[in-house]
Amino acid sequence: MATKFPKFSQDLAQDPTTRRIWYGIATAHDFETHDGMTEENLYQKIFASHFGHLAIIFLWTSGTLFHVAWQGNFEQWIKDPLNVRPIAHAIWDPHFGQGAIDAFTQAGASNPVNIAYSGVYHWFYTIGMTTNADLYQGAVFLLILSSLFLFAGWLHLQPKFRPSLAWFKDAESRLNHHLAGLFGVSSLAWTGHLVHVAIPESRGVHVGWDNFLSVKPHPAGLMPFFTGNWGVYAQNPDTAGHVFGTSQGAGTAILTFLGGFHPQTESLWLTDIAHHHLAIAVLFIIAGHMYRTKFGIGHSIKEILNAHQPPSGKLGAGHKGLYDTVNNSLHFQLGLALASLGVITSLVAQHMYSLPSYAFIAKDYTTQAALYTHHQYIAGFLMVGAFAHGAIFFVRDYDPEANKDNVLYRMLEHKEALISHLSWVSLFLGFHTLGLYVHNDVVVAFGTPEKQILIEPVFAQFVQAASGKALYGFDVLLSNADSIASNASAAYLPGWLDAINSGSNSLFLNIGPGDFLVHHAIALGLHTTTLILVKGALDARGSKLMPDKKDFGYSFPCDGPGRGGTCDISAWDAFYLAMFWMLNTLGWLTFYWHWKHLGIWQGNVAQFNENSTYLMGWFRDYLWANSAQLINGYNPYGVNNLSVWAWMFLFGHLVWATGFMFLISWRGYWQELIETIVWAHERTPLANIVRWKDKPVALSIVQARLVGLAHFTVGYVLTYAAFLIASTSGKFG
């Protein structure tokens, strides 16, 4: 007899109901719980899957390069990046009538195409690609790399090539290799690419496989490097009149500290970027030689952590026991990795628009909006995931004895203080921010807008002034030419001050009362999300109601007071609730960013400044006013090139609303409905010929919440993505 799904759990495979299928899918990646799983096998499986993951990333990027080269207009775009719209790929759709074919035949193409809003054209151009042949070569290279990684993944699952558990637990060696190899050497290699290929290409000098060994990146060659005269590499930078991609106004410097932006491309100077990556390479290569391996030299992390005990004794055992706790818990490691990656992804969103590094991307407004929103959403998901795995760590991996009186133990001991302070901050922010918005709404509605409570963000303006912004007249630090800070920063300051005080970029935007209010609304969202996540993680293992939940697991439902009241203590439910708050916060954040920038890009900053201080302003002048083109994507008179976004806007709402069907209903209702349908099916001629082996049962509470949340999330993202892209591209192309 064929074994039933899931093969990894005999217990589930023998379940006579449809629960078998859903629980099988839900636990497919929970390797720890699979039958016969050993710790060594667990590590080996996860290790091998990393190669598969990387293979997919390389394949995906290869596909992007290939489609741009095959169906895009890269070579035409390079000639006029500010006016030619980049093509992502062609569209072949049997549903298209003549109207749609005409509407989507755009950007100089002879057939329907999609416009690229990912910024890849700007990236390809900045790093030295100038022809379709370059793109094809990149695609083939990544395809080969992808195959190699797939093979490596398979190879590391073979008995002969499976690393041992001891190899996985050797944290110091792994850290050295990852610091020096992954970050250090790859940053050095990227510096090499920028210096040898990208910078010459930006100056009109072609460097390819045919001549890369004979073209010197700098006229002085390696002599200054070996003689210690490194300053030569910073002399004669590109001038302010440099035309990107040509020798006009080009210099010879390769590693500079100019500060600010290239006047024509409005992106960071490539020579500054190369210098930055070289500095990172040096730092990380040194860092990768710090830790003790089998050679017995260097620091032992375990010794360092165990020695971290405050001499006063007031903070207990300090970091004692943490090395083994972290090293033996994959969930702890994953939580740390997700938190770090979440923060860095949010920083990427922030810096991609404020300090754009790719040529001409600052003037591709739809791409800027899409990239900011994309990276902030990803950051949100990663951060929630960090806390989810932190909670699973407490349930599955935390050993109170091994962590007696250390910082982890003490965090749990005073968790009430942490949770209550977060609660207080959330309540304070919520009531005061909403109070101000609602007050302003009421007085505007009654025709007395002058009675609004408008608060200038003076502290934030002071911080901007300290960084060099002259507008507010604070005359402090970098905005004061005679200050210590200004004298110390003389090398890069002229370029930086030009950039920060220019009205044409997004670096340190002018802020007022509308920004003050929405900043606090976003702070409310962040603190409430954090409150739910921190409480969920700290109460995951035990709370007043259930002192130790180790055997109860992570994903049990919050079931209300009727069945024992587990809402206080379900870590899964905290994660579930936090997802809604995270999405809510991202809504406020991206609305703010987009509306503020629409005003700047259209030369009408007053629209945001005057209407963002009360709620109706947000609903009417941001959401409603900007969805006009979207709702008109197709109408009785025909179709335009926003129709796909108009359709997605509708479809996104539908998916989002479907989520509530799963979220606001009783499980018993579904069970009755299912049994009624089964009863009718079994008594209907012809239909009753078809039978199934599993007895249909309603989804469990946790499953229904997950399905509801998935619909809510996907619908929410689809709806806003369509709105963002259509409302921006409808105005600026």
From Swiss-Prot:
Residues annotated as binding phylloquinone: W670
Predominant location category: membrane
Transmembrane helix found in the keyword field: yes
Cofactor binding description: PSI electron transfer chain: 5 chlorophyll a, 1 chlorophyll a', 2 phylloquinones and 3 4Fe-4S clusters. PSI core antenna: 90 chlorophyll a, 22 carotenoids, 3 phospholipids and 1 galactolipid. P700 is a chlorophyll a/chlorophyll a' dimer, A0 is one or more chlorophyll a, A1 is one or both phylloquinones and FX is a shared 4Fe-4S iron-sulfur center.
GO BP field: photosynthesis
Binding site for chlorophyll a B1: H653
KW GTP-binding (keyword) present: no
PROSITE patterns in alphabetical order: PHOTOSYSTEM_I_PSAAB
Domain of life of the organism encoding this protein: Bacteria
Enzyme Commission code: 1.97.1.12
Reaction(s) catalysed (UniProt annotation): reduced [plastocyanin] + hnu + oxidized [2Fe-2S]-[ferredoxin] = oxidized [plastocyanin] + reduced [2Fe-2S]-[ferredoxin]
Keywords for this protein: 4Fe-4S, Chlorophyll, Chromophore, Electron transport, Iron, Iron-sulfur, Magnesium, Membrane, Metal-binding, Oxidoreductase, Photosynthesis, Photosystem I, Thylakoid, Transmembrane, Transmembrane helix, Transport
Gene Ontology MF terms in the entry: 4 iron, 4 sulfur cluster binding; chlorophyll binding; electron transfer activity; magnesium ion binding; oxidoreductase activity
Signal peptide start and end residues: none
Positions annotated to bind chlorophyll a B3: M661, Y669
Record: residues binding [4Fe-4S] cluster: C558, C567
Entry similarity comment: Belongs to the PsaA/PsaB family.
Purpose: PsaA and PsaB bind P700, the primary electron donor of photosystem I (PSI), as well as the electron acceptors A0, A1 and FX. PSI is a plastocyanin/cytochrome c6-ferredoxin oxidoreductase, converting photonic excitation into a charge separation, which transfers an electron from the donor P700 chlorophyll pair to the spectroscopically characterized acceptors A0, A1, FX, FA and FB in turn. Oxidized P700 is reduced on the lumenal side of the thylakoid membrane by plastocyanin or cytochrome c6.
This protein's name: Photosystem I P700 chlorophyll a apoprotein A2
Species per Swiss-Prot/TrEMBL record: Picosynechococcus sp. (strain ATCC 27264 / PCC 7002 / PR-6)
Underlying gene: psaB
